[in-house]
Amino acid sequence: MRRLLIIGNWKLNGNKNTITNLIITLVNTFYNISKCNVAIAPPVMYLDITKRYLLNSRIQLCAQNVDIHLSGSFTGDISAEMLQDLNVRYALIGHSERRIHHKENDAYIAKKFFILKKVGLIPILCVGENKREYDSGYTQSVCINQINTIITLLGIEAFKNSVIAYEPIWAIGSGASASPENAQLVHKSIRDYIASYDTSIADKITIQYGGSVTPENVTKFFDQKDIDGVLVGAASLNANSFSMIVQTAENHKKSYPA
């Protein structure tokens, strides 16, 4: 069985005081969570302080980005080994905001995937289509092409102990999510494509949904067979909203003890 995975992506939000208060609240709220996995991705400046508060908690640490190099003259970047030193478990790569604002392409993202696997961190590969691609019916082919770049470079084995997050670009931050039924179709197409290479990997890989996830709509996403959790943006910055999402996952029929 696949455990539901809930990740809060805080993006470029918060300051020392607000983030500290949010972390303390979440740690105290999630002390008895045992049937789903939870992680938070604070801004890089606050990874260390977050790590300290997460010690002995039920919450794991996720990075929002990683460089393709382990060391060298790369001003402003952070390596996978540096993240490892901070007890980071997951790292987001391929997020649409990185693709759009930093011009990261599939080949560059595949290098990030490689370096994370080399160090032993779990990559969360974000895939998804823009509004034009969605309207043209290219959703599934766009996602498959983004995944196929990883397979071409690293082989299907790279997806062992990895995560894929389907995030329709047009839904992120818009307040309009994909319908759970349509999201399920995309998730199934991704799992089926991976199964065409290796059914065991396909059965075990976690595929999250992201894009305007809220406490009000999250249950219907969890109800879908191939949706194994959610990548939460704005709602994860509100302790009550994020707690409701995590508690819904904890109580869902898909969840089970470690």
Swiss-Prot record:
Source organism, top-level taxon: Bacteria
Enzyme class: isomerase
Main location: cytoplasm
Pathway(s) served: Carbohydrate biosynthesis; gluconeogenesis; Carbohydrate degradation; glycolysis; D-glyceraldehyde 3-phosphate from glycerone phosphate: step 1/1
GO molecular function: triose-phosphate isomerase activity
Key words of the record: Cytoplasm, Gluconeogenesis, Glycolysis, Isomerase
Active-site residues annotated for this sequence: 95, 167
Pfam families: TIM
Location of this chain's protein in the cell: Cytoplasm
Signal peptide: none
The keyword Isomerase is assigned to this record: yes
Catalytic activity reported: D-glyceraldehyde 3-phosphate = dihydroxyacetone phosphate
E.C. number(s) listed in UniProt: 5.3.1.1
GO cellular component: cytosol
Role according to the record: Involved in the gluconeogenesis. Catalyzes stereospecifically the conversion of dihydroxyacetone phosphate (DHAP) to D-glyceraldehyde-3-phosphate (G3P).
Similarity comment: family membership: Belongs to the triosephosphate isomerase family.
NCBIfam families referenced in this protein's UniProt entry, alphabetically: tim (TIGR00419)
Complex and partners: Homodimer.
Name under which the protein is recorded: Triosephosphate isomerase
Designated gene of the protein: tpiA
